[in-house]
């Protein structure tokens, strides 16, 4: 009798798919849900709310885990069955790996009925049944006699949110059954890459026309990593060529500023030095504070925030500090050899530290520059990131205000469609005592940066105010 009924079809090719009832292999889930919840509580989830997804899955799972599949590919079950009574014959651990379709069991007859003929298991394991043993593989489980004594939780598992219920959960299941403990200390969950409208990237939607190799050729591998590393923890990231372009611009700037610094290090010899100029103390102290936040973000697995934090400092370094110190580097006869060396030492130190921090995101360009300028180790990726140890809190505070004054004065030039090199005939400032001392300590740098002819500083209790700025309009 022919019956007409609805069946599911494959989403791509439309082929009908029907389920057949067959014997399968299962792992017991239902009797240990509380154990799996307990292990989940022992793990730190990043972001924390992703732990809720794990708990919801464990609490709501309603059946045991079927680990067998009827496919042509996969890891085979190391099992045979007695042809007469069906008794399963399992391979011993020392005999693994085996393929029962081509290998025979290491027994002559069935221990139950004595039959000497065996039928191989034809099923293969589910994807998650094999990928869930990754911690054991990393610890070379089964390859050493004392494997139980050296298995410890891994520090970190990284994956996207959709496989919390599969890869994460089933790895926890395996770890529980093997060792009764958590497989890792931390889980870092990423989001998905989405198309511009927040849609899933799919050929059928026509929103995935860009080939990866073309993107690499256009923006570089480091540029792709900039885009990939800019996302927030646990949050979807939109594919954006604008972000790729920003990454390319940043990488080009890293290269260009490195070449500028290299040009001024031709006669530089690295040695102990503490007689830094005021503005050098400002940038060194600012980097030290920035790197504390940078490391904090990394410790929290907020890679995107760490990159953004580092990038903001880099542009401040280029747009402000380099513009100030370049006069000292170019004109030692005017500024003096020691102030010039202070600038050399500072750019040498800051660039080295920037390359170390950026190397996490841009391994290729940072290695290229490192090999050209430093080479105190085989690779920048083998160097140890050590925090700077300065006490420049006062210089940071007042240095930021000096930069603010410089920015306002430059803005005045731009508003008048003047070159930034336009001389300032008179700059009159109201400043408090601390800032006055700071400006006087860096007066050569300050005046050279703004091309100031006459600088007047008046006392005030406030931070600062520009009273008068007289531009040389004849040089327009």
Give residue spans per PLM region.
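Secondary-structure transition/capping motifs at alpha-helix termini
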Residues: 1, 109-119, 142-151, 175-186, ...
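Residue patterns forming the tRNA-binding/recognition surfaces of aminoacyl-tRNA synthetases
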Residues: 1-84, 167, 199, 207-250, ...
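NTP/phosphate- and nucleic-acid-binding module
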Residues: 1-46, 70, 85, 115, ...
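Residue-level signal for inorganic ion chemistry
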Residues: 14, 190-191, 254, 317, ...
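Flexible, glycine/threonine-enriched loop-and-boundary segments that flank and lead into catalytic domains
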Residues: 63-68, 94-125, 169, 173, ...
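Alpha-helical recognition segments enriched in aromatics with Gly/Pro capping
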Residues: 71-73, 78-79, 92-236
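Secondary-structure capping and boundary motifs in well-ordered enzyme cores
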Residues: 117-129, 148-165, 215-219, 243-253, ...
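Acidic, turn-prone loop/beta-hairpin segments
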Residues: 118, 195, 268-295, 323-408, ...
């Amino acid at each position: 009798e022919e019956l007409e009924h609805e069946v599911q079809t494959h989403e791509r090719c439309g082929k009908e798919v029907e389920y057949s009832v067959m014997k399968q292999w299962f792992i017991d889930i239902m009797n240990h849900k509380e154990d799996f919840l307990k292990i989940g509580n022992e793990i730190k989830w990043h972001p924390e709310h992703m732990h809720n997804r794990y708990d919801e899955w464990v609490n709501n799972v309603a059946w045991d885990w079927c680990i067998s599949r009827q496919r042509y590919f996969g890891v085979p079950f190391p099992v045979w069955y007695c042809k007469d009574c069906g008794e399963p014959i399992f391979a011993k651990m020392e005999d693994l790996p085996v393929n029962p379709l081509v290998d025979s069991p290491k027994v002559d007859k069935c221990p139950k009925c004595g039959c000497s003929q065996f039928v191989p298991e034809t099923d293969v394991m589910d994807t998650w049944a094999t990928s869930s043993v990754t911690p054991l593989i990393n610890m070379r489980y089964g390859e050493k006699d004392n494997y139980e004594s050296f298995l410890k939780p891994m520090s970190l598992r990284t994956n996207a949110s959709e496989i919390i219920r599969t890869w994460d959960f089933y790895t926890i299941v395996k770890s529980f059954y093997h060792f009764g403990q958590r497989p890792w200390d931390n889980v870092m969950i990423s989001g998905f890459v989405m198309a511009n409208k927040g849609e899933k990237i799919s050929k059928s939607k026509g929103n995935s026309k860009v080939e990866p190799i073309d993107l690499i050729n256009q923006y570089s591998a480091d540029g792709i990593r900039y885009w990939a590393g800019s996302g927030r923890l646990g949050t979807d990231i939109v594919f954006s060529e604008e972000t790729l372009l920003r990454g390319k611009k940043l990488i080009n700037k890293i290269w260009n500023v490195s070449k500028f610094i290299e040009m001024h290090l031709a006669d530089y010899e690295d040695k102990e030095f503490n007689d830094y100029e005021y503005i050098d103390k400002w940038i060194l102290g600012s980097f030290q504070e920035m790197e504390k936040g940078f490391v904090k973000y990394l410790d929290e697995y907020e890679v995107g925030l760490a990159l953004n934090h580092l990038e903001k400092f880099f542009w401040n370094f280029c747009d402000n500090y380099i513009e100030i110190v370049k006069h000292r580097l170019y004109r030692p006869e005017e500024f003096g050899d020691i102030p010039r060396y202070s600038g050399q030492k500072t750019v040498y130190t800051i660039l080295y530290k920037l390359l170390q921090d950026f190397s996490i995101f841009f391994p290729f360009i940072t290695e290229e520059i490192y090999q050209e300028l430093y080479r105190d180790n085989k690779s920048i990726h083998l160097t140890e990131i050590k925090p700077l140890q300065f006490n420049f809190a006062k210089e940071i505070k007042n240095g930021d205000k000096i930069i603010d004054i410089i920015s306002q004065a430059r803005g005045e030039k731009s508003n008048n469609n003047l070159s930034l090199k336009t001389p300032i005939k008179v700059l009159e400032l109201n400043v408090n005592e601390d800032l006055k001392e700071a400006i006087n300590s860096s007066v050569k740098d300050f005046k050279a940066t703004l091309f100031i002819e006459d600088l007047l500083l008046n006392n005030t209790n406030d931070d600062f105010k520009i009273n008068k700025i007289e531009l040389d309009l004849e040089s327009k």
